[in-house]
C-alpha cells in the first residue's frame, strides 16, 4: 500500500483511477476508463466454463464518431513476440533451430557489428538476456520510424552491449527482429507463413493478420496519440488481430494446446504480454487463480505521459471485478 507521502509523486489521474470505488461490472469499468481520457477501448474476457464476453467503450473512429466495436482489428505490437517464441520452440523441437546455437552461427556477418555475437544464444534472445541494445530506444529511430522500421539493425550496429550475454535482462525489440530473420533464413520462407501454418490455422484464428496490406483498413480500430489529431491506422506496425483471436491464442498457450508433444517443456518465454506502438496499447493476461483470459485494447497512447500506467490500473480493476463476481 502506498503511503500518503508517496502519493505526492504520483499524477492525480493515476491516483484517481486507483482509489475510485470499484464498479460492479466490467462495462462500468470500461465506461469509467473512457472518462479518464482514452478515446476507445475493447475488452475480451474468457472465463473457463462461460461463453466469452465482449465489452467496448468510446470511439472506434473519433473524427467520424463511430463507436468502438469489440470485433475490430487492432495492432497488437509486442504481443506478437509470443507467436514468435512459440514458433522458435516448435522449430527447436523439429531440430531446425537450436536454443544453444549463437547469433554468429546463423549470421556470421554480424560478428563485429553486434557485440558478443559469438556468445549470444537463441535462448538468450528469446528471454531478452542477450545484452543487444533495443533499436527503439535510439531517438534517431523515431525521426522517421516508418522508413527506419525496414532497417532497424542500423540503429544498434557498433553500439556497446548493455551487459554480458546471460548476465542480465533488458527488454529489446532487436532480439525478436533477429529471431524472425533467423527463422526466415533457416526455413527459406517467411516466419509469417510458418506462424500461419503452425499456429493460426490449427487454432482457427481467422482474424489475425501480419500487415495492414492483408486487410481492409475499415476493419481496423483507429489509433491516436495525445495532442495529435492524426489517425495512425494507416501506419504499418506488423500483426493485427481481434481481441477474441488474441484471447483464444493466449488460452491455448496457457493450457498447452498450442504445443505439440515435447514443446511446452522446452518453451522458454512468457505466457502473457503487452504491446505498445503509436496509437495502440494492448495487454493480454491469463489469471490462473480464476482460470480467466483478459485482453484489453486501448487506442490512445502518449509515450511521455501516463496512458500505459493508466491502462495497467484499468485491467487490474477489471480482473478484480471478475474475481469478486466469481466469489459472490
Q: Which residues are covered by each model-predicted region?
A:
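Short, surface-exposed loop or secondary-structure junction motifs
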Residues: 115-283
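Short active-site loop at a secondary-structure junction
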Residues: 39, 64-124, 163-171, 234-237, ...
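Short, flexible, mixed-charge acidic loops at enzyme active sites
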Residues: 54-61, 218-224
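Catalytic loop of the DD-peptidase/beta-lactamase superfamily, centered on the K-T-G motif
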Residues: 1-56, 227-328
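Bimodal feature
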Residues: 25, 46-51, 69, 114, ...
Amino acid at each position: 500500500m502506498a503511503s500518503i507521502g508517496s502519493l505526492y509523486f504520483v499524477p492525480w489521474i493515476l491516483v484517481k483511477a486507483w482509489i475510485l470505488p470499484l464498479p460492479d461490472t466490467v462495462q462500468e469499468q470500461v465506461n469509467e476508463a473512457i472518462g479518464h481520457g482514452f478515446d476507445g477501448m475493447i475488452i475480451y474476457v474468457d472465463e473457463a466454463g462461460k461463453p466469452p464476453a465482449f465489452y467496448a467503450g468510446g470511439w472506434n473512429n473519433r473524427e467520424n464518431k463511430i463507436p468502438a466495436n469489440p470485433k475490430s482489428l487492432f495492432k497488437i505490437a509486442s504481443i506478437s513476440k509470443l507467436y514468435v517464441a512459440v514458433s522458435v520452440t516448435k522449430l527447436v523441437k523439429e531440430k531446425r533451430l537450436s536454443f544453444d546455437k549463437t547469433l554468429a552461427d546463423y549470421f556470421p556477418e554480424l560478428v563485429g557489428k553486434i557485440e558478443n555475437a559469438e556468445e549470444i544464444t537463441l535462448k538468450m534472445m528469446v528471454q531478452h538476456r542477450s545484452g543487444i541494445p533495443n533499436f527503439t530506444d535510439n531517438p534517431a529511430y523515431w525521426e522517421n520510424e516508418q522508413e527506419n522500421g525496414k532497417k532497424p539493425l542500423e540503429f544498434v550496429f557498433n553500439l556497446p552491449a548493455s551487459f554480458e550475454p546471460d548476465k542480465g535482462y533488458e527488454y529489446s525489440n532487436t532480439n525478436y527482429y533477429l529471431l524472425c530473420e533467423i527463422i526466415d533464413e533457416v526455413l527459406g520462407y517467411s516466419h509469417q507463413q510458418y506462424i500461419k501454418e503452425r499456429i493460426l490455422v490449427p487454432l482457427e484464428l481467422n482474424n489475425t493478420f501480419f500487415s495492414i496490406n492483408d486487410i481492409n483498413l475499415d476493419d481496423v480500430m483507429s489509433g491516436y496519440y495525445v495532442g495529435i489529431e492524426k489517425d495512425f491506422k494507416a501506419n504499418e506496425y506488423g500483426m493485427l488481430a481481434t481481441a477474441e483471436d488474441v484471447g483464444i491464442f493466449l488460452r491455448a498457450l496457457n493450457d498447452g494446446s498450442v504445443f505439440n508433444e515435447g514443446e511446452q517443456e522446452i518453451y522458454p518465454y512468457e505466457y502473457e504480454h503487452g504491446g505498445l506502438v503509436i496509437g495502440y496499447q494492448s495487454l493480454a493476461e491469463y489469471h490462473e487463480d480464476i482460470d480467466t483470459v483478459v485482453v484489453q485494447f486501448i487506442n490512445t497512447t502518449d509515450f511521455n505521459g501516463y496512458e500505459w500506467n493508466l491502462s495497467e490500473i484499468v485491467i487490474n480493476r477489471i480482473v478484480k471485478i471478475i474475481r469478486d463476481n466469481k466469489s459472490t
